[in-house]
């Protein structure tokens, strides 16, 4: 019985490349001369550092621009609160979303059931498994989800025949 998984996870290699490119541009830009502006990457989160709120917004703009060029959807990013650190400097933690949330998974399963396509959707942890008897039905579900589910960047993997 053919099946596939609907997941929501960023390509971490491309995220790392985008962070490195953003840091390179920030270090060479004239308006950041003498500034301690940078973006650091840890497990599943990014931290943007800058001298003030205005420069922090510019750092985030550079990061978003580089992510868009690397084909990383910016809907993966979840911005935390801006925190003041030593002196006037500020930082902001940016979490990279991973996995399909419970509400989104329920909505995806509901969309699959309402579409009247002969497939079954089941929630399995942070993914939604879709299985059916025909490969064409699964491809129709993928097309329908790409068109209708816009809240999160969905990815389809683990396609089995």
UniProtKB/Swiss-Prot annotation:
GO cellular component annotations of the record: cytosol
Pfam families, per database record: DUF520 (PF04461)
Keywords assigned: Nucleotide-binding
InterPro entries: DUF520, UPF0234-like_C, UPF0234_N, YajQ-like_sf
An example molecular function term from Gene Ontology annotations: nucleotide binding
Its biological purpose: Nucleotide-binding protein.
Family: Belongs to the YajQ family.
Protein name according to UniProt: Nucleotide-binding protein Rmet_2899
Organism encoding this protein: Cupriavidus metallidurans (strain ATCC 43123 / DSM 2839 / NBRC 102507 / CH34)
